[in-house]
């Protein structure tokens, strides 16, 4: 969503043809759809899926067990009205610039004040312009709280951005390896002989002209054994490759946070400058790396939720088993 939003915003700049804006995606509507789906998943589907999965076949469904999902679903709704009444308003202070005074009134006032005081330049500026500080109260809608509470997920992203690459690399390191004990060698020899006999039988049937459905089914079974082993090897090799790439992305993200986010003022734009230079060279050259970095950060947050688990009041979201 973020790369698509950035591309669509750039296509509506003033120096571009106005008709290009009509060809862009409706990003505002798409963002609302994503937020609504995320809200339904986080607050309804994920918390209460355990209540449905814990019900095993063969168990007696007593009244206490039936009331448990009702209580779990009714308690959050009973807490929402008082929380909404107490937390639905936000107080914030804004600065309202005053109007510039007319030269005639300003000169008349300055002549009268110079007779009594020796004015400095600061006092003159205070008299020229008067700034007002206003305290306003605004109504916070529900999406505001959803966006504000998303700051909690930074913990998962911070934990997993460091451990996700290492987990992938260690998964390759601790992959199943060849163990040539006597029992394993005997079992492997037996399965190899069986597979060899089946393969030779299929070859004889194919040479004899039999190409029915049964032959194709048996050939598919034999090929599936070889394919599954090849995919297993490629799966662990892919973990190693993505682990190394993820380690590089994590280091770059951490450096960007240190030099741009934690330092005030920022010491160096770093990733921002890189994306700007790539975007000036070509549209896809700037959008593709930006999408990769965003997607990696989102995957780190999701993986961190699965790795740590989180308790929201009495509801378990992504519990770690």
Swiss-Prot record:
It is a multi-pass membrane protein. Keywords: Membrane, Transmembrane, Transmembrane helix. One of its GO terms (cellular component) is membrane. Belongs to the LIMR family. This is LIMR family protein SELMODRAFT_432210. The keyword Transcription does not apply. It comes from Selaginella moellendorffii. It is found in: Membrane. It comes from the Eukaryota. InterPro entries: LMBR1-like_membr_prot. Its main location: membrane. The chain crosses the membrane at residues 28-48, 116-133, 139-159, 240-260, 284-304.
